[in-house]
């Protein structure tokens, strides 16, 4: 099993929306990837709580794949590429980690 974890920091305002509005749209689009990319075994998306440290990242994605080959299929999938194109102008920073469980 391979875990793929990505965190994004978002601009305060981007594309005419607030950070919170964009975070909610990002979450919706990410969760929808499970319906489009069968290689995703599990998917979870979190938005940093307003009660949490404001220095935390704004949005986190946690996905699981059977192997690195499935992760590669996911990353090249047109639905994932569409998401990358959508999120890029909204984010100020991104980090990611991929590891085997």
Where are these regions (language model features)?
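Short alpha-helix boundary/capping motifs
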Residues: 89, 99-100
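Short S/T/G/P-rich N-terminal loop/turn motif that feeds into the first structured element of a domain
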Residues: 1-57, 66-72, 100-101
